[in-house]
């Protein structure tokens, strides 16, 4: 038998598997510390690796304990939770879409720019609007580029498996 293709998982194989918050943008009116606390409390309950990056980023900044209820994983999209009677979302574009949250042009442009840089964008929304965009980066391993080049030299096609959107995946692959 001759191997002619290989599939590599992005996180932890091609990248270091240690995502960190690289950028954050709060929409006007959402810079309030209360929103940071809400985001932190929701992400603290999530099991997704990107959530841990957000938790680490805000753990020193959280000043208020927030009571979160009705926490739900939305498979492949993110999480939803309630604080008081308000529903909050943390996740990807698909979660915004199914929740009927509109992503305005400025936030869309910023998200596309970050994704083009190879970052994964996490959206935080509440009250029917986007409150923040969080860019999470996972550094590509030093050895990955050479390993992929060596496989290509041997005539082996390399495919990357990722939960990221196509733009982020393309930036990492390039």
Q: Where are the regions a protein language model picked out?
A:
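Cytosolic catalytic headpiece
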Residues: 1-174
């Amino acid at each position: 038998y001759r191997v002619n293709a290989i599939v590599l998982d992005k996180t932890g194989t091609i990248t270091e598997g240690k995502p960190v918050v690289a950028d954050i943008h709060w929409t006007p009116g959402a810079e309030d510390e209360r929103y940071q606390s809400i985001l932190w409390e929701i992400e603290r309950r999530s099991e997704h690796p990107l959530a841990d990056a957000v938790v680490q980023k805000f753990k020193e900044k959280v000043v208020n304990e927030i009571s979160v209820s009705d926490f739900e994983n939305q498979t492949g999209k993110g999480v939803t939770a309630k604080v008081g009677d308000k529903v909050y979302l943390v996740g990807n574009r698909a979660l915004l879409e199914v929740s009927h949250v509109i992503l305005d042009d400025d936030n869309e442009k910023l998200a596309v720019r970050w994704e083009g840089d190879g970052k994964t964008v996490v959206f935080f929304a509440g009250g029917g609007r986007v409150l923040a965009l969080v860019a999470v980066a996972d550094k590509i391993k030093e050895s990955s580029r050479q390993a992929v080049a060596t496989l290509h030299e041997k005539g082996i096609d390399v495919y990357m498996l990722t939960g990221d959107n196509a733009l982020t995946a393309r930036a990492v692959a390039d």
